[in-house]
Amino acid sequence: MIIKGQEFHINGLTYTVRSAVQTDAEQLSEIRVQIDGETENMDREAGEGFIDKIGFQKIIKTDSEEMKNLFLVAEVHNRIVGFSRCEGSNLKRLSHKIEFGVCILREFWGYGMGKSLLQQSIQWADENEVKKISLQVLEKNEKAIQLYKKLGLEVEGILKNDKKLSDGKYYNTVVMGRFTDTFHKRGEEVCFTEGNTM
């Protein structure tokens, strides 16, 4: 699905959150690799699960056409610096769910882009009768966990020793969820998974 873009002014930086279009594909392919190499908060290391320009064009086309999909980018002066994606399922038993992933270039951390992408996605999900929002986040990513709590998500469980990072140690993953029944009368289910939708 495609939504109307919105401009944000945070900490002296102006950026736009809008739906992805075909001409974004090459930039998206490049920054995805860069982001994966900048943080261990994602599931991938740099270059793993590579998606080229054509691959992103196909994803953008699908997400623009499917009612339960949403692909957003954060843009600064015509440069894409982050993106998020909601992906639904065609399976009837899973049709109420949407999986969400978000990533931002490290140099643009601290400008609320992740929050803006998440809030826009939550608003879109609520307007499209989505019932539950859930996500998975590394337990050591305390800032993200606090943000998710502020946006109405609660801890649902812990995946013990879920990820092995570069220091050779194993880290837990926190599963969080937001039930829209608590916030308004109608809705369905959205899954937020850090870095898994790409």
What positions do the PLM features span?
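Terminal substrate-recognition subdomain of acyl/acetyltransferases
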Residues: 1-11, 168-198
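Conserved catalytic-core motifs of GNAT/GCN5-like acyltransferases
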Residues: 134-137, 149-169
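A short beta-loop-alpha structural element at the N-terminal edge
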Residues: 15-30
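Acetyl-CoA-dependent GNAT
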Residues: 48-107, 118, 179-182, 192-197
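Helix-loop element at the rim of GNAT/NAT acetyltransferase active sites that forms part
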Residues: 11, 30-47, 62-63
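Conserved GNAT acetyl-CoA-binding A-motif
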Residues: 125-136
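Conserved acetyl-CoA-binding loop-helix of GNAT-fold acetyltransferases
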Residues: 104, 110-123, 127, 146-150
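Glycine-rich phosphate/pyrophosphate-binding loop shared by adenosine-nucleotide-utilizing enzymes
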Residues: 13-15, 77-83, 171
